[in-house]
Amino acid sequence: MSNVQTSAEREIVDLSHLAFDCGMIGRLKTVSWTPVIAGDSFELDAVGALRLSPLRRGLAIDSKVDFFTFYIPHRHVYGDQWIQFMRDGVDASPLPSVTTTKYPDDAGYVGTIVPKSNRIPKFLHQSYLNIYNNYFRAPWMPERTEANPSNLDRDDSRYGFRCCHLKTIWSAPLPPETKLAEQMGIESNSIDIMGLQAAYAQLHTEQERTYFMQRYRDVISSFGGSTSYDADNRPLLVMHTDFWASGYDVDGTDQSSLGQFSGRVQQTFKHSVPRFFVPEHGVMMTLMLVRFPPISPLEHHYLVGRNNLTYTDLAGDPALIGNLPPREISYQDLFRDGRPGIKIKVAESIWYRTHPDYVNYKYQLLEGFPFLDDAPGTTSGDDLQKAILIDHNDYNACFQSQQLLQWNNQARYNVNVYRHIPTVRDSIMTS
């Protein structure tokens, strides 16, 4: 009888680790990742402290912080190659890696240092792309499809991809392809009533898909069904935690800084994932996103930018609001120096559903507050996508120094995995 070990009891494995990370405002950063095996049960309890770099001025507004933990099967990354890999076992061809640049921090977006070979596993890079494309990219924006990290912009590879501003009237418009009118051909002397109803129905289903069902899972949900994350190879969002990071002002006490003060932000946090059963090999990735509310001293209410107010603008008539098509406006209608070439489409009377922030213009004359100095898109031409995505450079003037970039965190990720794996002693004492 052979004494070769072919199985193992399911034991708890402690994969806890510390992470000292830093990043930029508005960029999606991987802060922890753990490879997992089919049959695992994964638990995470992350505790730590988030700090913003020293602020130049007093603390004006809190920042919004989001933590996300995703599960991504390797099969979503490698496809049929992964299935064949597992079938062939020890005779399988090695899985390919992807190339990076030679700088140590150019894989920071996936939470690792670049090794000497300047290559990292493909599952890290592609899993990050899948997460971004499914959860952090507006559906009308083109997907990110870079085959290798070396193809990325250096800021993207070091700090993560740019994400959208928090929702406002100008940062969350309707898709650019939204129709403002719909034509129906009719005969000269008659109207097909049944055809008219059919046209209404067709328009309704087209609008539903344009506005609310741009992804397959949303379409199926509209029928009362649901789809597995396998249906469209999307990462599974296991847990999301969000909070507002606040702080305090520090008064200067020495002779040179007496009477001056600056803001300090230090916020403790906890992000927990209850026990999650892993159905097949993959990776658990935890990502972090820090954003300031998008506030500009140049923003004004939509009604303020209208020279001649019409009944439709001002009355808030429910009959009109419920039946008029979307309205096309420009950034010039919302910002003093907004670009007229940046057109957005919004629901009728959206200005009665939201209200802009107000900042006295004196703030515009000072540097150091976490406000947008210019109207969004001022430096990027008439590109709506660039106007909606956060540019961390807009906040450079807020910080006294960026030695640890714009935010940093120190955290312990308490990871316990229940796993079928022989003990270290069994591995040493082979056969």
Swiss-Prot record:
GO biological process: symbiont entry into host cell
Pfam families found in the cross-reference section: Phage_F
Protein name: Capsid protein F
Function summary: Assembles to form an icosahedral capsid with a T=1 symmetry, about 30 nm in diameter, and consisting of 60 capsid proteins F. Upon virus binding to host cell, one of the spikes dissociates from the capsid and the virus interacts with LPS through the exposed EF loops on the F proteins. After the genome had been ejected, the channel formed by the F proteins at the unique fivefold axis remains open.
Subcellular location: Virion
SUPFAM superfamilies named in the record: ssDNA viruses
InterPro entries for this protein: Capsid/spike_ssDNA_virus, Microviridae_protein_F, Microviridae_protein_F_sf
Gene3D superfamilies in UniProt: Microviridae F protein
Quaternary state and interactors: Pentamerizes and interacts with H protein, G and B pentamers to form 12S pre-assembly complex. By binding with protein D, induces joining of twelve 12S complex to form the procapsid. The procapsid has an external scaffold made of 240 copies of protein D, 60 copies of the internally located B protein, and contains 60 copies of each of the viral structural proteins F and G. Upon genome packaging, interacts with protein J. The mature virion is composed of 60 copies each of the F, G, and J proteins, and 12 copies of the H protein.
Organism, as annotated: Enterobacteria phage phiK (Bacteriophage phi-K)
One function term, GO molecular function aspect: structural molecule activity
UniProt GO cellular component terms: T=1 icosahedral viral capsid
Sorted UniProt keywords: Capsid protein, T=1 icosahedral capsid protein, Viral genome ejection through host cell envelope, Viral penetration into host cytoplasm, Virion, Virus entry into host cell
Keyword presence, Glycoprotein: no
Misc note: Phi KhT, a host-range mutant of phi K, can grow on E.coli C and B, besides K12, and is more thermosensitive than the parental phage phi K.
Family: Belongs to the microviridae F protein family.
